[in-house]
């Protein structure tokens, strides 16, 4: 295993993802993790991530110096390299010419870490400081136009001023793999087939004959959780799907068909009337979310109680992912937690269930691979993200059944046309937003005053940042024509060309 010490870089999770893609199990912990906990994990190597601080600042992030007593190879990336230089007596200063974006890396000396790597390649830079003097015993391995010491080495300690984990670094994945395999002696043992076998065995042992309650949303995470649990405990899984009336067109039927194919019993609750009555007259986005969250818990509790009376439920399953676990601990210290993640928060006290989180070691892309391994259809696994509150946050203003129907039909047309044009898998997320704006139009000889709808399509890797998708005008024209002709109550279609930032992907 490789252990990454996180110093607050926006790219830290990418380090683990790049190594895992290559079959090398990798975990992330905050830089202040105790040496005792690090020793317990028994890593074969450490990677020190980048970060926003400067090593010469008073409040610079610094791990325990005892990491150097572990006698394992260490790789410092960006800030991590600067920390190594500073710790061993070199000099780091603010750079006159800061480096952000692509740069050409030129290898000047052979090293095991550059085995099979091109002499010159593009790398991704993101730093305001630079090393001007190496510590005693260190050697320069590579340079860039503005960084004379772009890669350094001293025995089994390495430093890279660039970010090998970012896709723009052409040879970055190979460099990380060389460190893990050739320097640390790791083996390629990580993969979803191995994970599935191990996790099913673990779940069987932990749950035994107890019952597990699992809320199914129709999304990828909850579907994969339910599938994995069913493989382990069969009919002791109680899967509950709440239809709140704010789903995409034909969503309920699609989820039911999927679970039927997977041979997993599904308890479907039709709660449309309950949700819509509570949302009546509400237009404020956060209040919508709050009402939907609270109502979901009420409906879920009622259903859980029915099953609880039939036979005691001992566990509650959640689709917590590894990024949720990482983000629950801030690099600023235990007292400054970024956020605590609960997929189903605010459950009543009588639901004193033990929590079970089968996916807590996995990234989103790994969840999809696991789903494929478990037999979930590829078409289902590659669906675009869908918000928990559903179409409620895609209808601006007050919600009504007629507005839901209007949005469902328009959204269905947009997605259908994306698939026909082989564009669906090329955009990260696409959907329609029903605006609380009416506009004047003309249909035949008649004046209309109807809803406007907005098409939204973005490209992203993880949703943290996103750029709007460049869709051909002819494609947009086709979608617009279909919506205005086929969906009653819509006479205008617009396309959102806002990126994130400054906008968010969803409108509410």
Swiss-Prot record:
Residues 1-189 form the Glutamine amidotransferase type-1 domain. GO terms for biological process: GMP biosynthetic process. Residues 190-383 form the GMPS ATP-PPase domain. Pathway: Purine metabolism; GMP biosynthesis; GMP from XMP (L-Gln route): step 1/1. The active site is at residues 78, 163, 165. ATP binds at residues 217-223. Keywords: ATP-binding, Glutamine amidotransferase, GMP biosynthesis, Ligase, Nucleotide-binding, Purine biosynthesis. Its EC number is 6.3.5.2. InterPro entries: Class_I_gatase-like (IPR029062), GATASE (IPR017926), GMP_synth_C (IPR001674), GMP_synth_GATase (IPR004739), GMP_synthase (IPR022955), GMPS_ATP_PPase_dom (IPR025777), NAD/GMP_synthase (IPR022310), Rossmann-like_a/b/a_fold (IPR014729). It is an enzyme of class 6 (ligase). GO terms for molecular function: ATP binding; GMP synthase activity. It catalyses: XMP + L-glutamine + ATP + H2O = GMP + L-glutamate + AMP + diphosphate + 2 H(+). Homodimer. Catalyzes the synthesis of GMP from XMP. NCBIfam families: guaA_Cterm, guaA_Nterm, PRK00074.1. This is GMP synthase [glutamine-hydrolyzing]. It comes from Helicobacter pylori (strain ATCC 700392 / 26695) (Campylobacter pylori). The gene is guaA.
